[in-house]
A protein has these predicted regions:
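Amphipathic alpha-helical interface elements
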Residues: 1-247
């Protein structure tokens, strides 16, 4: 979502290959002086993405030699860090991509009136989520962090991360957040990070005996109100178990 928002804004202004040919200017530029780390990181990431795209095309289609870069193909191969680096203050200033395109990329309610403060908050959100994403991709415990000592600490930490994702989505465009809410994805994520779900997967959750439609209706209401998955047991000749999940 962030990738597409930035790409669409910059492509409309600087052309489809806006990252190439020196189009992406930065604040501290000086002749014969190397680019600062965030700027060089963006360049390196796009160069790597182009190589990855080319290698994939040669492998998939049996093409030899150079492969003509394809805008969407290169963008799709960029690392997530690319978009964090693009939010660096080096790209903020007169004639630069920020704040010129800030209101196009971040169409939701701004947390501050100053463009610089908005850019900083967006960058902090992305940095936090990138670190969390990397932890998940490397199969590290998602809940681990300094100061997390108890189950309650871990669950609060995970809920905070979901909140960060919601904040970033809302900042980019409220419609993005609305769609995820409508599909139940965020609700499911919040429910997954609860003590009730831990107990359920430990097979320690209460199993509710359903012996009437009234009891079933009350459990359905409870599940929806608490955003919880409830285990139910029904006897119809033999015992049958069901899971009630909000939809």
């Amino acid at each position: 979502t962030l990738r597409n928002a930035i790409d669409q804004a910059l492509a409309a202004d600087l052309g489809r290959f806006w990252w190439a040919g020196g189009k992406l200017r930065y604040r501290s530029f000086a002749p014969s002086v190397g680019a600062p780390y965030p700027v060089q990181a963006v360049r390196d990431n796009f160069a790597k993405a182009a190589r990855t795209y080319g290698a994939e095309q040669r492998r998939r289609h049996g093409v030899r030699g150079n492969v003509t870069p394809h805008h969407a193909g290169v963008i799709a191969k960029t690392e997530f860090s690319t978009w964090e680096f693009l939010l660096d203050d080096e790209f903020m200033g007169r004639g630069l991509i920020w704040p010129k395109h800030l209101s196009v990329v971040f169409r939701g309610p701004w947390p501050a009136r100053q463009a610089g403060a908005v850019l900083t908050q967006a960058r902090d959100l992305v940095a936090t989520l990138r670190d969390f994403r990397n932890r998940l991709f490397h199969h590290e415990p998602a809940w681990k962090r300094y100061g997390v000592l108890t189950e309650a600490d871990a669950l609060q930490h995970l809920q905070e991360k979901i909140g960060k994702a919601e904040s970033l989505l809302a900042l980019i465009h409220p419609e993005n957040l609305r769609l995820l809410q409508a599909n139940g994805l965020l609700r499911d994520a919040h429910r997954a990070c609860t003590a009730g779900e831990i107990r359920r997967f430990q097979h320690l959750a209460q199993v509710h005996k359903v012996n009437s439609l009234g009891k079933l209706a009350r459990l359905v209401d409870q599940s929806a109100l608490e955003n919880s998955a409830l285990e139910a047991r029904v006897y119809r000749g033999s015992q049958q178990r069901f899971l009630l999940i909000p939809s």
